[in-house]
């Protein structure tokens, strides 16, 4: 198991290195000059050139790349062109916001989909199975931003459980912050939860049809014991993998959710940085997102290998 974990860590590092090269290359060749964006189009060529030199934009590509990557390894994400402050300080507080949103959403997906998926598989064809099937179809058809608007209207304006747009910062009131983040997390999680319920139910029913399950049942093992001891262990593996895969989609959807609920997270900072060509901020956020996706993917594989040694 140790060798497998080390192999995954090495793979993670190589993937991030490749992503860093592509990201840096992309923002080096796209049209637009950060110096002009900061000084304005009326600035003289001399001032533009002086600022480019100050920002280190005139050096060879490969030198600038290795300098940037070296900074990443030291935790130095660079200096913001627009705000003239360290990128780590600019986006550090927003990272906790997005991490909280993603973790809450993943917990909702896992906490709801597993028990309901098991229940509907165990009572397949029953009344509640049909009810959950209809509900799943409805939620899978709803985009997260639309769910966000509906939840904002219902919980914020009808039930008045929170004030829409009145975001509470974690540094002021952490419990208030968590309370405000629950609704966005639900909006982000519900479509994925519906998918996970359907996937887990299907996998359990498929596993129950296999010879080992039929043999165990014929020997007198009751349905519940067979389900939890053998079938669920094998059926849940694809669901764990799927949860890891949807993490990337959650990050993309989270940017929209931020706008819907007025959350000052990484998504808003990313859009703002792109509009003013603040490339160090954009590159840092993209790398953080890439790290999150690759890390969760590697963690999912490690959990899969721990549960099922055949994967190693």
How would you name each of these model-derived features?
Residues 16-66, 159-180:
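Hydrophobic alpha-helical transmembrane segments of membrane transport/permease proteins
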Residues 61-64, 68, 72, 90, ...:
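Low-complexity, intrinsically disordered, cysteine-poor segments enriched in small/polar
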Residues 53-62, 74-87, 168-181, 188, ...:
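Membrane-interfacial helix-loop-helix junctions in multi-pass membrane proteins
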Residues 6-16:
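N-terminal signal-anchor/signal peptide hydrophobic helix marking the start
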Residues 2-3, 95-128, 144, 173-312:
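Alpha-helical transmembrane segments of integral membrane proteins
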Residues 23-29, 59, 67-70, 134-164, ...:
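Membrane-water interface segments at the C-terminal ends of transmembrane alpha-helices
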Residues 16, 20, 24-29, 145, ...:
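Membrane-embedded alpha-helical segments of multi-pass transporters/permeases
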Residues 58-114:
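An internal, D/E-rich "acidic patch" concept
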